[in-house]
Amino acid sequence: MKKLLLCCCAALFAANASAQPAYEPSPENLAARQRFADGRFGIFLHWGLYALLGQGEWVMTNQDIDYREYEKLAGAFCPAAFDAKAWVTAFREAGARYVCFTTRHHDGFSMFRTAQSPYNVADATPFGRDVVKELAEECRRQGLGIHFYYSLIDWWREDAPRGRTGRGTGRPAEKEDAEAYFGFMKAQLTELLTQYGPVGAIWFDGVWDQDENPGFDWRLDELYELIHTLQPACLVVNNHHLTPFEGEDVQTFERDLPGENTAGLSGQAVSRLPLETCQTMNGSWGYRITDLSYKPTDELVRYLAGAAGRGGNLLLNIGPQPDGALPAAALERLAGIGAWLRENGETIYGTQAGPVTPRAWGVTTRRGDKIYIHVLDWPDAELFVPIRGKRVREAKAFADGRRLEFRQDEEGVTLRLGERPAGPDHIVELTMGK
């Protein structure tokens, strides 16, 4: 994942704005978009050789590790505790509807068996197993979608184009060969889309690496067309921090809810595509042994509700340990989110953003004639909600069905909340009339 503030040039924008010109999503693709939006909650997994060093997924470039030295990590990668069934069971019980896994991150190591390079988890490690295959099959068995993160950057391959990251990894500049590298990526994407069953999405990352070279062409048109040809229902997601290009099916935001830009990576306009925000449980994407600053479960629940109230999904990240186990702190939070969703999932899954834009007190979601008021931060006994046009037939506390007093005028509805119950999200259900 990109850690530095993005400063993209207008020329880069123009060069990529028509990634797949005249793209017309297929009926299968449109149905997949709706399923994606209905799911609302996914799990992101950053796992690779970098976990062994315990310094996050950018350690290779942050520490300027020579690529020939870094590749030696493969000989020590033997995660005996990896259990795809245990992972997916934890995700399903947390209420997640899909999983996005790093098939190949910026360090260039493939976490699947690929004929395109021996530098992969099945051929280069004593572990000798195809992690992507096991995870995809288990997701399918348990009814979760599988999405594949795929980096456009490669700090290990000698032919990969040099960008503003990975410059200290020792690769000889004279061996750069963009044509060969793009051929490699297309061949790997073909493997991922033909050997692992239905794929919910390909999640690209790294366009921003060439923001100092505005004339650079990532040839996204070819990549997007390949994906939509091999699997028309597969969604294209690109974490470029720009407004969506033609050919993309989802707009994603990094470390921010749609419409916010607290991290400096999400200043782009919000589109009409399905939306997703990716966020970390602690402060890191890949496993970082010193990062114990996990967000409280209540904060994560509020973030999930905040995403849904903006019409978006939450893709919540976990960095598995070097031994293949999920951190205990992550499992604890997954269990807490799952408990909350079992009680309140009706107000999240399959909903749309509500009629009231996000406020200091919280957000709204809606389904049919129901509007759900998610009161995330409001200390007073009364709450004014500017809902106009339709009559409110009934207001009740979602948790226990207790009817709430309210009054309505042409400006909106004032709810008498009473004593606020414990928990991260006080939900009020409104039943609307005509």
Report the location of each language-model feature.
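Sec/Tat signal peptide C-region and signal peptidase I cleavage site
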Residues: 15-19
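Mature catalytic domains of secreted/periplasmic carbohydrate-active enzymes
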Residues: 20-434
